[in-house]
Amino acid sequence: MVREALQFLSRLRKSSNLPDPFTCNKHIHQLINSNCGILSLKFLAYLVSRGYTPHRSSFNSVVSFVCKLGQVKFAEDIVHSMPRFGCEPDVISYNSLIDGHCRNGDIRSASLVLESLRASHGFICKPDIVSFNSLFNGFSKMKMLDEVFVYMGVMLKCCSPNVVTYSTWIDTFCKSGELQLALKSFHSMKRDALSPNVVTFTCLIDGYCKAGDLEVAVSLYKEMRRVRMSLNVVTYTALIDGFCKKGEMQRAEEMYSRMVEDRVEPNSLVYTTIIDGFFQRGDSDNAMKFLAKMLNQGMRLDITAYGVIISGLCGNGKLKEATEIVEDMEKSDLVPDMVIFTTMMNAYFKSGRMKAAVNMYHKLIERGFEPDVVALSTMIDGIAKNGQLHEAIVYFCIEKANDVMYTVLIDALCKEGDFIEVERLFSKISEAGLVPDKFMYTSWIAGLCKQGNLVDAFKLKTRMVQEGLLLDLLAYTTLIYGLASKGLMVEARQVFDEMLNSGISPDSAVFDLLIRAYEKEGNMAAASDLLLDMQRRGLVTAVSDADCSKQCGNEVNCS
């Protein structure tokens, strides 16, 4: 096709005759469809320079191509120049511009193009359903729900929605978490005598799967089968992902089997989703079984698949296998990304292999990566937990530090009892424009309680409340522990009651803490009361019921 177009251009240069519009359009389309769009642009420019007046569709083909390249400003210049060559732009010309702006994420410019058509009152041309569908698609990608509602009303004054319109609305509503609106649009579509297609169903199924409402998703899937609609790989992927996220791996496998039976070829994303699902359930064997299936299909692992497998193996305590996968990845000429490097660092630290973790960090730098906040936080946390706090501080970077990194370092310093450095870091947080959060305060309070410095711990609690931060279960438990350790049981019980009044439900740990403290001071009645309260809440205690009853002299039935 390209050769034919080039031969035509060669003959044209030797001839004084200009081509007819049909021949010109044919060759421009051939060049664009053969990925020679730049050549088609030069071809059109040559014809114009010869005084030829191209047909509008020739310009439109080139405009569409230029927009898909992302060069929408250049495409606009072409559209605006069309009248100079005796050719008026039509709605197709402007639709390409709207679509181009939306592809670039420039929704405002896309809206302005459509509004210019409306404002012309048909003098230029009227927007059609494609104009609105392109704009709605742009809104959908940017999750601009309010704009969808505005332009719904505008569109209905010009034209009626079609299947594409409804599908786009449904997709937007699902992405915005408005599932009831999505389902309502689905039913409205049917009332308008429009039949939902595979895209419509898939958008809705994906929305319900992501919301965790699998039964509605499955009912839609069954409706698709009932009307004998062919499901595609995207539909199956949405369902499989929904089952995996819920941990329903048997149903995920059944859907995979149905997919194969329907002769829909599973792609890399399907396999990666199932592999991740099994790893999340702690089932490494089945995860590796599906990895073998994936490789037997002749699929090459991409960076995402490698990341899922490495993370899954590390999370299931299979560091040796994860290391082998990283080596296999590098042999395949794929460079691990920042996430994989950080995952491996974290796994090495957790297994006590600090040297290997630090080596992985240096390897990350050697590969040209600049450590991000997650990588630096992992380093600080890992080194500090391995008892080398001062070395960890070396990796602290004020320029990159966020609340997570500050929390990690403050927690480590508090465990070491270095409260002077903690105080200094708190001042740095404010200078950096960050606000200390409850996790930072809780770590500080815990450190002070551990040292028995209850006065400063409660001062910090007051400061925390003054800054509008609510204490959580961990903060209250820490304070109760500090008071109980000092034998201040009246005060400990007051903090416990304050926690209950604030609406926080106690866990087994805080009950056990108080019960043991009461037993230690011989207040068995108070211990028994707490044990009964704990049992009423359905919590399991490490304190023996029999011991409690015995020590109470059987005054209270604790069973």
UniProtKB/Swiss-Prot annotation:
InterPro entries: Pentatricopeptide_rpt, TPR-like_helical_dom_sf. It comes from the Eukaryota. It holds the Pfam family PPR_2. PPR repeats lie at residues 20-54, 55-89, 90-120, 128-158, 162-196, 197-231, 232-266, 267-301, 302-336, 337-371, 372-396, 402-436, 437-471, 472-506, 507-541. SUPFAM superfamilies: TPR-like. The keyword Heme does not apply. Coiled coil: none annotated. Keywords: Repeat. Belongs to the PPR family. P subfamily. This is Pentatricopeptide repeat-containing protein At2g01740. It comes from Arabidopsis thaliana.
